[in-house]
């Protein structure tokens, strides 16, 4: 007979010592085949090591639950965070209480020990495809397929794969298997693939991928053969709808049971519960009142953690939108409404701007000079033209040379 696990034997030994006062710790350890020192530690109230938090743990249970809830909310909005984002959430909560940041592998280990979270590779999701993935529309399509098979007596063996190009005999995509073979050639330093090498690789990939099991799995996964629409409909996202407010639901309101509140309505109910308990408190144990206050504090702390994460998200969004706002506010000058653009049309706004700057410098007095001397007039170093810089003159000559060469051509 297989003996129970070590932890179960330890619990039985502690229970036996508690029930039988004459049973010594040494005898219980020998009877249940467990270490004597471990039983002594358990009798003094020490818990198992696996039940204790890690010594290097940075976040509390409430903070970790807040991060998990925030990740699930982001995933519900189709914006699941990366591991780097989860690490930033934890560091932001730690900065709120001046604690050191988490380690490099903290996010990976955090997701690993949370049963609600799992890492997946993201892929591009087309917006038009997402709009068509409506359970109602796809359910009607399955009904149409079933009606067509019943009307014309089509059996499962006569079902083929069609698309907008029809049935193309011999044209079957085997991308993953073919890609693996090409990778093997690349690792062998074969960078140029000829027709012969391609045909050999394609033949091997075709027979490796087009197996009976893969073909049947494709039709089974699509819910066609065997006919099972729920295999597809169950994977689609549930359409969002506005829930009914609790106050508008029929029936009598249930009395509030003390627990940790997570929204405004539950917070008000918990507060009313505490007020009622305090007003009816007369020479009774304050344990229930203290527990209710602790639950209210726990809920308020969780809300504060969520507010801190939201503030971090808003700050990052503002920082990302700041350059875009500057570009939108920038002044845009329309050079020409239509028609061909000539060199002179593009040069006239530049000349007017530079002449305006030169005239402004002439009218403004120089406060550093004696008697309010006028500022030095801006001239080009090449052609000595007033109000024109050397770079502008170079651009003018380049445009003229380009137009002349184009006309000669």
Curated annotation (Swiss-Prot):
The keyword Nucleus applies. Residues 84-113 bind DNA. Keywords: DNA-binding, Nucleus. SUPFAM superfamilies: Homeodomain-like (SSF46689). Residues 255-269 have a biased composition (Polar residues). Residues 243-269, 320-350 are annotated as: Disordered. Part of the gene cluster that mediates the biosynthesis of chaetoglobosin A which has a unique inhibitory activity against actin polymerization in mammalian cells. Chaetoglobosin A and its intermediates are involved in the morphological differentiation of C.globosum. The first step of the pathway is the synthesis of prochaetoglobosin I via condensation of one acetyl-CoA, 8 malonyl-CoA, and a L-tryptophan molecule by the PKS-NRPS hybrid synthetase cheA, followed by reduction of backbone double bond to install desired geometry by the enoyl reductase cheB. This is Chaetoglobosin A biosynthesis cluster protein C. It comes from Chaetomium globosum (strain ATCC 6205 / CBS 148.51 / DSM 1962 / NBRC 6347 / NRRL 1970).
